[in-house]
């Protein structure tokens, strides 16, 4: 005797499948990362990230207009300065590359939400996310002195027009410090999207080519999270929420969907997932070799992040995905 319930009944046509679909992906879910460099007319493709470019500010503005026209509501800016120093001056100077890019984008596309990555690794000669002890080659960042740099960076970015401040350095207390600095400077309405559960991942390799931020010695395991930990992620989120975060993030996304799911179950705040460079480049490499259907794999992957609980997805696939979803 056949069963009374036949799940295939609701899979019999595309229209019916769409009607009962539990998770729907849209271009409004995306935040598109952009890499700003000095100069004019610069569009230099990142070798390890096909289709991703380092862009001068005039080209950033062109991209921003295209992104907005595709229905993508937000970008996040990363900067590659001309000069680097131990005080990460390029991160917090009012004439820094991210500050200039944020101002230019907001003037050209005021409706587009501009997030600013608030970190220091692109701006230091050693590639670590803050101050180091003199002579220390382990990469152990001095936490509290670094917080002062993050305060200045966040305020400078907000003054330049950034709509969202996104601290990514995984310093203890960085959300509270930045919240206090923003409030003190008159930016109490500027939200913080905290990289709350940022793992010390091997998936970041291509990004470090794009941002020119590879550590020159040591690694980042003394401040980014151990990939084997999940309870620690919940603690990090709990701390960031208590300190005033408005959005919490999991990075990377693909290997950490269990973390996205657990965090979504513990907080009412929006949860962002960062579909990182290594995840992107693996898909691009396989697609360029004809091994996979790029469109289907990308949309399936992004849908899975949302199904796991992500409200927002930072992804280099954003423009392509928006076109495919249109």
Curated annotation (Swiss-Prot):
Keywords recorded for this protein, A-Z: Heme biosynthesis, Lyase, Magnesium, Metal-binding, Porphyrin biosynthesis, Zinc
Keyword hit for Nucleotidyltransferase: no
GO biological process terms held by the UniProt record: protoporphyrinogen IX biosynthetic process
CDD domains xref list: ALAD_PBGS (cd00384)
Name of the molecule in the record: Delta-aminolevulinic acid dehydratase
Active site: 198, 251
Gene Ontology, cellular component aspect: cytosol
Catalytic reaction annotation: 2 5-aminolevulinate = porphobilinogen + 2 H2O + H(+)
Protein family per UniProt: Belongs to the ALAD family.
One Gene Ontology term of the molecular function aspect: zinc ion binding
Amino acids binding Zn(2+): 119, 121, 129
Protein's organism: Synechococcus elongatus (strain ATCC 33912 / PCC 7942 / FACHB-805) (Anacystis nidulans R2)
Co-factor note (free text): Binds 1 zinc ion per monomer.
NCBIfam families: PRK09283.1
EC number in record: 4.2.1.24
